Amino acid sequence: MSSTTVAEFANELKKTPETLLDQLKSAGVPKAAPTDALTEADKQRLLGFLKASHGTAEPERKKITLTKKSTSEIKQADATGRARTIQVEVRKKRTFIQRDDGHPATPEVQPVAEAPAAAPAAPRIDEAELARREEEARRQAELIRRQEEELAEKRRLREEAEAREREQAEKAERAEQAEQEAARIAAEKKAADAAAAAPAKEAAKPAAAPVAAAAAAAEQQAADTKLAAQTAATQAKEDAKAKAAAESKARADEEAARAKDLDERRRKALAEAEAIRAMMNAPARVLVPHKAPEKPQPEKAAVKGTLHKPAAPAARPGAPAAPGAAAAPGAAGAGKEVKSAKLSSSWAGDPAKKKEIKTRGDASGGVGRGNWRGGPRGRRGSNDRGGHEEHVQAAPVEARILEVHVPETITVAELAHKMAVKAQEVIKQLMKLGQMATINQSLDQDTAMILVEEMGHNAVVAALDDPEAFTDEDVSAQTAEALPRAPVVTVMGHVDHGKTSLLDYIRRAKVAAGEAGGITQHIGAYHVQTERGMVSFLDTPGHEAFTAMRARGAQATDIVILVVAADDGVMPQTKEAIKHAKAAGVPIVVAINKIDKPDASPDRVKQELVAEEVVPEEYGGDVPFVPVSAKTGQGIDDLLEQVLLQAEVLELKAPVDAAAKGLVIEAQLDKGRGPVATVLVQSGTLKTGDVVLAGSTYGRVRAMLDEDGRTIKSAGPSIPVEIQGLTEVPQAGDEFMVMSDERRAREIATYRAGKFRNTKLAKAQAANLQNMFTDLSAGEVQTLRIIIKADVQGSQEALAQSLLKLATDEVKVQIVYAGVGGISESDINLAIASKAIVIGFNVRADAGARKLAEGNGVQLNYYSIIYDAVDEIKVAMSGMLAPERREEIIGSAEIRTVFVASKIGTVAGSYITSGSVNRSAHFRLLRDNVVIYTGEVDSIKRMKDDVREVREGFECGIKLKNYNDIKEGDQLEFFEIKEIARTL
């Protein structure tokens, strides 16, 4: 029974607690403080006293009844399986009894208390009767609610049973038994609640016999109500079963009739479609033009045409109808217009129509796959839905299957426009294919073509409508006589095998001495005038990091000189150079260098090269082998003779009086001269003032320098030169050509830059989505962020590739930015924002950048040899690796006694059998030589004193942390965990 305090009740009555205490005291309810509990019996006693004190006049003002109504909606499937919305209205009624205002009792009221049992008896009986009726109403409401719940549960179980009534009949029986058991338990619980409420009701009504009789009558009525409810529930179950069986049979009959009707309508629709198609394919007749009537007569049923096709012959008044238009008189007799885009009014709402390809074009209907035509789109497409006005309908056309030209990258919006559909439809199809995309996101060509095919159109690789298509026309329009040109020879081989030294002897220069570390770190281009003619040489790096440079050198060359040290043999980069030369399809001349050394073995080199499918001429192959010495000059003349002999066989020719074309060998950003590119002219003549297009950059040639730094005015075929005047630093390996005007060059460069950006963005988005779950599953991975600035493009590319190869599963390398030129303040700001380190390869930072780096703690690293840069980055990555944890056993002990202390717990009295034990050690508990627990030592005591360490041969008490299950005879093994730094 609920109870409240005097203060809470006074707050509800809007009285002061002191006033309520006085009234309670006058009513004979002993309450001394506002915090005392106030029961319902006390409230009834106070109510009776107040009624007796103030009389029972104006009873209509004593009670106020409020009715509250709330409406909600639920969705429930009907017998046909369709979801319907049901309005649920809940009504609540609450009665408030108006209390009298709290005024202290006056002395004139005291005589009323002489006979307290006579006067208040009648109102108390009325209140008891009211309470009994309210209790009965609540009981009835509870019974009705339970019945509704049972009926709802039965309905749900029935619907589930209907879906699988053939194979799960016994399961339905068990569900029904469970339902009956739940109803019985609910009834018993309700009876128990009523029995529990009876004593409280008796305590609230001590007035005796009439009240007891009323309570007995109420119990009897409750029992009768319960019996009636059970009988009604049983009857409702039987009725529900019969109704469910009838509904199931009716649904089966209805579905069979609907299927039959649908087949009939489809057959008629196909027949009408064939008739309309025959009418449209009939030869057109020449009609006399006349003004169309303002409003056609209803009896003249006609098939309207589109704006692009003449109307069908049946549309002319008085003309004979087409053979396929036999259905028109019936439609005219019904007084309705024939809809060419609509085969059946009932089939127009079929859900299968929604699966067709949606287009922005003529949506009035057309024959699609399987000769099925979609109905009209929008609200105005229904038959006579807009009132009495007539609608001009388009003639039936075949479903449009478009030929969509897909470029390398295309946004979702552009692709939707090409297919004449909404962008939302394209996004939905992408989601079905497992890719999330926005309306402005770029798609790569493969994804876009798959998407077009999925949407029922034909995808075609687009013939790019770009300005580059006109460059070939400009070049082909030029006619110039092809003249013999000098061969371009690339020197390739392993690092430190003497490639640059060999070229130095040929050029009579000392280039190798000027290279950092004595190794070549960028492509060197030279042309040498020999007694037998001119030869252009490209010196490529031999270090493993410069793979891309060697590949570019092989593409631009005519002949490859493969340098192999006689004392070292074939090495990894030698094999790689052979692959590059064979991929480029250029002949190879092998130079066996360092034959002047005592340990030189040319025969071993030949055997190793034969294993790589480079067979010398003396073994029946086609590759000349020349033993040379870059130190003494032995064999140099023979090598040049072999090179020129190969050039004569190739018959190298190129036009001279034409616009220049060639290849960018190397590029860099010079602080004083701006972007500088080393180019190799392959055909034509490059002159000062020409407009050059190189990749996505362009510019006018301001100056040209040869390999010796001398200014020249022109350069013919096979001549390497250094040009200035480009807008940006080009990519090494890009092709360059001379354009007719600067405007055309700017257009092409801008187009290439945008195309490169879109392609890069599409690939980056695909990579991000692809690696999303991989990154989540991999956990936290350390990342070393690096900014690279190098002197030339090739060195920057090689260094970036070498550092990316150092990445492991635990530490990754992220190249935040890589470029050429000195380190500027913008590079330092980028490093601050991305928390990266800055590497300068053969470049330095200016004063402003150094000051900014020192003030913000940015690490600057300068290198001139790629070995040093790779080694130091590897050390830095090793420091980011998580240390390796190793266990080192330090001792063991035997438990001889077990002590149990109330405040401490279980203590192991142990004897140290080997090694020692300290308080920071870990332990393993062994029982019968089986490890049963591993943990940490809590404390060690010896003779009641805490000690840090106990050595072999001593006894001590050991308290194990969070473990007490120890026995005599157990073994303790102590160990320490040490962290050891890992390396890559």
UniProtKB/Swiss-Prot annotation:
GO terms for molecular function: GTP binding; GTPase activity; guanosine tetraphosphate binding; translation initiation factor activity. Residues 92-267, 280-392 are annotated as: Disordered. GTP binds at residues 493-500, 539-543, 593-596. Residues 593-596 are annotated as: G4. The keyword Cytoplasm applies. Residues 493-500 are annotated as: G1. Residues 363-375 have a biased composition (Gly residues). InterPro entries: DNA-bd_dom_put_sf, EF-G-like_DII, EFTu-like_2, IF2_assoc_dom_bac, IF2_II, IF2_N, P-loop_NTPase, Small_GTP-bd. Residues 539-542 are annotated as: G3. It comes from the Bacteria. It is found in: Cytoplasm. Residues 104-123, 193-235, 310-335 have a biased composition (Low complexity). Residues 124-177, 236-267, 291-302, 351-361, 381-392 have a biased composition (Basic and acidic residues). Residues 518-522 are annotated as: G2. Residues 484-653 form the tr-type G domain. Residues 629-631 are annotated as: G5. Keywords: Cytoplasm, GTP-binding, Initiation factor, Nucleotide-binding, Protein biosynthesis. GO terms for cellular component: cytosol. One of the essential components for the initiation of protein synthesis. Protects formylmethionyl-tRNA from spontaneous hydrolysis and promotes its binding to the 30S ribosomal subunits. Also involved in the hydrolysis of GTP during the formation of the 70S ribosomal complex. HAMAP family: IF_2_B. Belongs to the TRAFAC class translation factor GTPase superfamily. Classic translation factor GTPase family. IF-2 subfamily. This is Translation initiation factor IF-2. It comes from Variovorax paradoxus (strain S110).
